[in-house]
Each structure stands twice: as C-alpha cells, then as structure tokens.
C-alpha cells in the first residue's frame, strides 16, 4: 500500500553530509555532550545502503571527479555558483549553479524499511533520471519534550526520565547527471 510523504531535495553539502549520515565518531564528538537531537542509544536502529555502482569513494571525492570530468569533456569549468543575468525585458534573472550531487530528506514512519526507501529511490530514477547513491534511515533523531506527551501523541517514548519525540526520516543522496551527458548537468 502506498503512503504519502514529502521530500525536500537541495544541493548536497559534500563536506558534512556523510559525517552526519554515518554518525562518525568525530561528528558525534562535535555535537557535544548535550546530544541535542540525537540519542546514541537509538543509533543502532539506523540503516544505510550505498549504491554498488557508486564504489567506495566519499561524496567530496566523487564531486571532485565530476568537476574534473566536466572540464575534460567540455573544456570549461563546471558552473557551480548561482549567477544573475539580464533578460530581454531588462529584468534580472537568477540562474542556478550546477549541483551534480543533491540530498533529499524523506519523512518516514517508524516501521519504514530500507527496502521501502530503496524502492522510492528506484522510482525517482525511473521517473526523473536521478540516481540514488546513498540512503540513510535515521531513527535516532528528534527532540526532548518538556514533561509528558499529549494523550494523542503515539510516537513519543521515554528514555530514562525524559520523554523523546522522534523525527523519523531518511536521507537520500542523488547523483544528478549521467556520464554520457556531462555537459548537460541538470541545474534545476
């Protein structure tokens, strides 16, 4: 049965995305003792999938390889920054920069599986030609409640003495280009 959800896709911050998604030791140290929105005891419930075609490079290396390939194939540098130009009517038009790696956050339910999200990624690839490179299910994020939850709140639960309201979601990192059409990187 299909369920409704939402996803917000934007250019991926390749320098910090993997640290957050993989919960690296350095990332966990940097968010500090307060663990504002992550409960480490719940991190074992997180799941991940890396597209076998992606290989074992990290996102920044992959991004740098794309930049180099664009330069080799087109003779020009990849246009990364947003820029403005004047239209025929004299109005200023913003032109988006190229973002070959993008990340979307998909809202999920507590019982959503990695297979469910992979199926969603496959549908995105079929419909729009965007390739899922990495998928991370996060079931350890949320926020602490002040006191007990409302009676109709069925998701919050107790961790020690405090009540926690989970924010179940999945991060999907998409490749937004094809090897054959490097000069036609999608920028919208």
Language-model segments: which ranges?
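N-terminal nicking endonuclease/strand-transfer module with a His-rich metal-binding environment
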Residues: 1-183
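Short "domain-exit" segments at the C-terminal end of structured domains
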Residues: 184-188
């Amino acid at each position: 049965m299909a369920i409704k959800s939402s996803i917000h896709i934007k250019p991926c911050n390749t320098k910090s995305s993997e640290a957050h998604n993989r919960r690296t030791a350095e990332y966990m140290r940097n968010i500090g003792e307060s663990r504002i929105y992550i409960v480490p005891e719940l991190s074992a419930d997180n799941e991940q999938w890396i597209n076998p075609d992606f290989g074992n490079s990290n996102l920044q290396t992959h991004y740098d390889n794309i930049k180099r390939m664009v330069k080799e194939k087109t003779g020009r540098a990849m246009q990364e920054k947003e820029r403005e130009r004047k239209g025929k009517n004299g109005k200023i038009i913003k032109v988006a920069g190229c973002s070959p790696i993008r990340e979307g956050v998909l809202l999920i339910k507590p019982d959503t599986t990695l297979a469910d999200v992979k199926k969603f990624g496959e549908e995105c690839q079929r419909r729009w030609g965007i390739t899922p490179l990495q998928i991370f299910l996060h079931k350890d994020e949320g926020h602490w409640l002040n006191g007990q939850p409302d009676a109709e709140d069925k998701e919050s639960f107790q961790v020690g003495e405090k009540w926690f309201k989970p924010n179940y979601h999945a991060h999907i990192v998409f490749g937004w280009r094809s090897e054959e059409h490097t000069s036609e990187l999608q920028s919208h």
